[in-house]
Amino acid sequence: VRTEDGKELDKDGTPTFKAFPEGKVDWYTDAGFLRYSANCLACHGPDGLGSTYAPSLVDALKTLSYGDFLSTVAGGKKNVSASQDLVMPALGTNKNVMCYIDAIYVYLRARADGAVGRGRPENQDPKPAAYSKAEDECMG
């Protein structure tokens, strides 16, 4: 794991979390919780555990690659069966999601790996300057 502009990256360059003792986390994990709660919770349920009409993202992130996660969020997904028609809208143009997609992924990855429990994690790190700059550029 390496840190680049305040963001933790795994050996493949995929954003990842940094857990500290006593349940505290890095900025991205905490920000991801907030953005997930604002944009994803209504369908995928509290803490990423799923609902009657959207899957558990905690379970999905155990096997879903970063690229597949980005593709699904940006392009949407449709699963049709004899009993139900499940549709996730494409969110690729939603700045409230896409400007924070790495933070959302990091939070869900920490949940999937069991590093973060239910509820809001305690923040440890200050907001990285690079995060603020990227946020300002993305949101316009």
Predicted regions and their residues:
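Short alpha-helix boundary/capping motifs
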Residues: 64-72, 85, 116, 132-136
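The canonical Cys-X-X-Cys-His
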Residues: 36-46, 69, 73, 88, ...
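Electrostatic cytochrome c docking/interface patches
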Residues: 1-35
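Short charge-dense sequence patches
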Residues: 16-26, 50-61
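Sequence context surrounding c-type heme c attachment/ligation sites in exported
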Residues: 30-41, 50-51, 64-68, 121-123
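Short, low-complexity, Pro/Ser/Thr/Gly-rich segments in the mature regions of secreted, periplasmic
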Residues: 125-140
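Solvent-exposed, acidic/flexible segments
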Residues: 25, 29, 33, 62, ...
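Axial heme c-ligation environment in periplasmic c-type cytochrome domains
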Residues: 51-58, 76-103, 108-129
